[in-house]
Structure formats: C-alpha cells, structure tokens
A protein has these predicted regions:
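Phosphate- and other anionic-substrate recognition elements at nucleic-acid/protein interfaces
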Residues: 1-143
Length: 143
C-alpha cells in the first residue's frame, strides 16, 4: 500500500492537534480535535488516502492509539525520552509539535516504542489496581 499522507499527532487529555503532510513535506491540513472516541473515529474515517501516523507516548495516548489504529496504514508511538527534536525546540506550541512529529514520521526518524496489545494493557491496569487495594488493606491493618 502506497502511503501518501503522514500525520503527526500532539496528544493531550482533552484535545489532539494534528498535522497532515505529503511525502514532500507540504502541509495539507492541520487542526485540533476534541479527544473523544466519536470525534476521532469520524475524523479518521474522512481521511481519503492511506496514511502513516505517529504520536508521542503519553498517559492519554493508549486509547487514542486504539481508536485511530484501524484507520491507518501504520500508526506508531514515539518514545518520549528519545524525541528530542520536540523537547529541545525553543519555539513550542501544540501546532508546531504536531508539525514536527509529522516531519519525523515522514522522514522515518521516529524513535518508536513498543505498544502492548490491548489485552496486556488491560491486565496491567488490573494488576496496578490490585496493588493499590492490597496496599490500602495493609495500611489499614497496620493502623
């Protein structure tokens, strides 16, 4: 499948900024979306070309990755500690971050990180919750 568009996502709790670029770096579209399943699905469904997307791994990027992944030719998460181009820039805002992520994925320079399958992430979530409950029970017994 020939990928024609490269999309950079700057993910936040309540919004997602995006920038769509062609293979030569021309900006086709950019904007901000509300971070909800319905809005993201509708937006991704309207993308006409096969696209390759990337976002920085954050606390909120897991469910966004799961929502967008079926629509993308390829979707990756960038390792936050290794994405120095964004962190080191002097001029920072969400729009510019999305542009830089689109350029990084377009040039195939994304330091990708492992994204565990949904089942594994759900097991991890349950184990974290269990550890919390066990810790609270232990604190109560020790009072």
């Amino acid at each position: 499948m020939n990928v024609n568009h490269y999309i950079g996502f700057d993910v936040h709790k309540k919004s997602v900024n995006y920038c769509v670029k062609t293979a030569d770096g021309t900006i086709i579209d950019e904007g901000r979306l509300r971070a909800t399943h319905d809005v993201l699905r509708r937006w991704a469904g309207e993308r006409p070309e096969p696209w390759h997307g990337a976002m920085e791994a954050t606390l909120f990027s897991g469910w966004i990755y799961d929502t967008l992944q079926p629509f993308a030719a390829e979707l990756q998460m960038g390792h936050p500690a290794l994405m120095k181009a964004i962190a080191a820039s002097k001029k920072k805002n969400d729009k510019l971050d999305a542009r830089k992520i689109a350029d990084i994925v377009r040039c195939n320079l994304l330091p990708a990180c492992y994204v565990a399958p949904v089942e594994i992430r759900e097991l991890r979530r349950m184990l974290r919750y269990r550890n919390l409950v066990v810790g609270q029970a232990t604190r109560m017994k020790n009072k």
